[in-house]
Amino acid sequence: MMNHPARPAAQLAQLTSLAQPALPAQLARSGGRAILADALQESRARTLALLNVYVASLGEELIVPDSPQLNPPRWEVGHVAWFQDYWIARNRQRERGIAAEPAHDRPSGRLAQADSWFNSSLVPHQNRWDLPLPDFAAPRDYLAASLAETLALLAVTPETDDDLYFYRLALFHEDMHTEAAVYMAQALNIPLPAALLAPARALPENRALQLPAQDWQLGYSGNGFAFDNELGAHPVAVAAGEIDSCVLSWARYLPFLDATGTAPPRYLRRSNDGNGNETGNETGNDVTDGAGWQCLVGGHWQPLNIAAPAIHLSWFEADAWCRWAGRRLPTEAEWEAAALTLPDFQWGEVWEWTASRFHPYPDFSAHPYRDYSAPWFGERYVLRGASRATSPRMAHPRYRNYFTPERNDIHGGFRSCAR
């Protein structure tokens, strides 16, 4: 990555176009100190707002079940504070950007055992429930102290991409954890205030978009921040074909359940007619109302909005619908090309499963946070887009999300392509 100067907001505002990501994502990746300072404080405010919701529901002990899809909330809070502290205040090579040596000697942290408690590279997921973590006040104070020092250092940091790299990384890292906290709240039946999610929007009518044949340059190139798995832009032959203009709605998904007898997805159930008899759609056509279905939101069952995106679907459920409908999932190259070239391609409601396994691009080189991508290549599938729980800063059309195919706790959905 070259050491280019960061761009001021006025210049970035001119970049919004069909071929550019939404402005918040571009600002976060290429903006200067003032933009980053505001973003870091906004992200921390969301972290604290979510923490307050958890405390109100669970108490200050913040005890949750041991599960592969959850993390102990006290560990999460400490980890977010530790990550920012470790990669910024304690990082003697932060001005080197991606050339920094990750294992260099660092000064001691503000919590004596922080490295042994909160370093996710050293603490396996299953061990996090057994750590002798400090009481609730210590991680909260850790959050405040780490942010204060980060902002003080940022104020005197040169405005180049190398110098700002770790500030941007810490920002995106915290945004990822606040999104994970939204997923975990749903899994724990914790209701969230509406302000912590983007407003729900009914999907427009789906249309068949024609994606022309092309050699698509897959991946990120240019100035500003990029995740290591986005780099290595390379041409990929994309065949001409048809792709949905928007993600699948429940109205399109539910007939598959009735036609095949497939069990409903997570957080979805059939309602009944008042006499204990389940109701449903037996016609195989698009569902026109949600009278036969309910969804679980924040611990409460409510009528399903069938115009809303189908959500909390695993890769297997998305693929099964496609096979039933004679369709297929797009590859990540098809998705990226459509998002950046087709004006009517709508995205941002749910993370979208693709047919592509998460593999490195050519000449992949891990960035200093070594465990961000490399350990997960091959076993996961790529999701593209963003969801209502995603910070707008993360909603970049070249961003590669990735999960194991059974995950149905995330805000995952899909769109389809013609075979």
Model-derived segments and their meaning:
Residues 85, 90-129, 136-157, 241-339:
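Active-site microenvironments of metalloenzymes and redox enzymes
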Residues 202-218:
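Extended, Lys/Arg-enriched charged tracts that mediate electrostatic binding to polyanionic substrates
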Residues 213-233, 260-261, 271-274, 291-296:
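Short acidic N-proximal helix/loop "leader" segments that mark the beginning
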